[in-house]
Amino acid sequence: MYDETIPDLHVIKTGKPSCTSYLILGDEMNVLIDSGINQKFEILKKDLEKIGIKTNQLNMLINTHEHVDHFGANIYLQQKVLILAHRYAATKMISADDEVLLCRAHGHDPKGYHVHIWMENINVIDLGNWFLKVLHTPGHTSGSICIYEPYKKVLISGDTVFANGTISNISTSGSYGDYINSLARLNTMKIDLLLPGHGKISRNVEEDIEKAIDNAKKKHNKFLKYDR
């Protein structure tokens, strides 16, 4: 299903275990953020068509990190859409390393993926009516990013932060230290609308991030005690 939260931004939910995808209709180009798992591609395609967009009208696809529930359906789009990811995510996506091989649990072959543009922190993408700022937010994975629109104060957070302060698991390439630092950085920004990779959207963003920092610190301390 899809929902329009604010003008030119569409929320697309194809169902678990796939992530939430976000479509931004820009003045200059159309951008999809995260494609979901490959098995949900037909649902994604139909939801895009309900909005009035065919897959060949997508110009860019930005992946928030290197987990298959966020990039699996790229395989059906990468021949006609520019794929963007942070360079730390891109290296895993194209080489099918241990992080990406986890996608076999979803019955998917991890080989054959492409990333056309390797992004860095604070890269910007100007769509005319939307100004997208790339924030490198490692922690969940080393290649995790958030997409921030500073004028609309919207954050598309991938798996970095969720509503109600729910925190992400830490993957093999991530770390609690990086995760807490990334959350603290987000906590300095003005954000009115949180659009996470899973679950509900939120307008209580400052409270959500503060809860997430507290939860991450508690989990990190528990891990340190157990590790001893």
Predicted ranges, named:
Residues 1-51, 146-158:
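Conserved beta-strand hairpin/beta-sheet module of binuclear metal-dependent hydrolase folds
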